[in-house]
Amino acid sequence: MFCVQCEQTIRTPAGNGCSYAQGMCGKTAETSDLQDLLIAALQGLSAWAVKAREYGIINHDVDSFAPRAFFSTLTNVNFDSPRIVGYAREAIALREALKAQCLAVDANARVDNPMADLQLVSDDLGELQRQAAEFTPNKDKAAIGENILGLRLLCLYGLKGAAAYMEHAHVLGQYDNDIYAQYHKIMAWLGTWPADMNALLECSMEIGQMNFKVMSILDAGETGKYGHPTPTQVNVKATAGKCILISGHDLKDLYNLLEQTEGTGVNVYTHGEMLPAHGYPELRKFKHLVGNYGSGWQNQQVEFARFPGPIVMTSNCIIDPTVSAYDDRIWTRSIVGWPGVRHLDGDDFSAVITQAQQMAGFPYSEIPHLITVGFGRQTLLGAADTLIDLVSREKLRHIFLLGGCDGARGERHYFTDFATIVPDDCLILTLACGKYRFNKLEFGDIEGLPRLVDAGQCNDAYSAIILAVTLAEKLGCGVNDLPLSLVLSWFEQKAIVILLTLLSLGVKNIVTGPTAPGFLTPDLLAVLNEKFGLRSITTVEEDMKQLLSA
């Protein structure tokens, strides 16, 4: 096992990365190794997808499957080894079908890629794990050095984050051939184990630029189906009655669940990154979508144990449900998996609803505590002139984009402390689950404009980017000249690709934490600092002073 893709990876003087019987996320060595094997199979599939496009062959089954299967290897998504192997087998079957299509056009069709003809050696998981050792990401570290390995992983993990967003967009009916062609090209190239530093740096920026397009079609999919989010108050306390909790990012799953629970007497609560769903008109119209439950994903083993109903996980993040013994009432969807946990293969939630009706539910309603979400792209753009007016009248001094992932590390209290000392004449724009560090605190307003503005899920960084570009255009300056600072927390690969997206768009002087990614060496961090001004957090007071004076 070697995995260094998330923020909580093991760090030692001898090197970074989880390389024992089990990773910090709870992933076993077996599952981790089989995910490496799956990635190799997907790289071979992408190699043939690139070749097929040369002949004008576009296989939509391949295009929809490849990013979805890659998504299953993202942190805290799928811990189920047999399902990972199933994805690998499907990747190889699709590859062979695509290869046959190519050969039907050109009998001499060939692909020069070491993954292009990969076959699984056995049905036995142990044998497959041994085969996977051939594809462990650091297998040639001694030959290429830590810097090249780090850049490879930056590209691989960034592309993995983009693949997750591609899957979210695809679920909503969004497809862009140019994006998929670019994805396959990059995925196939990474399967050649590239070792050119400049080429890898360029690839990381290409991934960022591609992901901006992905976020654009995801935004179109969400707003096209469910309307543009508008400011909405959400209750974060319990309401009496039967209940289901739904977590993750998949708004379509939430919509289907709301449709199927309507009239059943079962209330639905969002959790984690599903919180922004309350801002969408076509979702909040369901009166039994009664609130949001819990805090950051890392607290789920305590909070899920207390929830008196079933739980549905639609995407990341799931952690071991057996520890607090709620594994009999947690359900997985789509690419999510945990051994022994029931999986929903389709859109039918009737078994979950039946279970909810058989459980006690909340016995009484708690005193409501309302927070506000729903500052989507359209709402933010509508406020652009107000923001400019407040700045011109010196009522608004600075905007802090304070968001990103949450996690268990104690140093993450930095983001709570930072939010609480933001001056009263400054605004906090937040997104993703890092908001749970401070989104239940009171921040007041500036002439009626809330000082805490929740823009949505992690992918809604797109809305923040569009707002920044709009403000810069109206003020006749560059984005980096705005009174705007980005203080981002990271945990997994979606955050990595958001960072690459920002850097590829030329955004500079981003501050990140709580730690630097374990796969980035001091040399690579120095390069990113020199090129983009990217740096790690220090102390709340010092960072605030520096950002306000910039």
From Swiss-Prot:
The positions annotated for binding [2Fe-2S] cluster are C3, C6, C18, C25
| Note on cofactor | Binds 1 [2Fe-2S] cluster.
The Enzyme Commission number assigned here is 1.7.99.1
Question: Which cell locations does it reside in?
Answer: Cytoplasm
Protein's UniProt keywords contain Oxidoreductase: yes
Name of one Pfam family that matches: Prismane
Sorted alphabetically, which keywords does the UniProt record give?
A: 2Fe-2S, Cytoplasm, Iron, Iron-sulfur, Metal-binding, Oxidoreductase
Q: In its UniProt record, which GO terms are filed under biological process?
A: response to hydrogen peroxide
State the similarity comment: Belongs to the HCP family.
Please identify the protein, giving its name as recorded: Hydroxylamine reductase
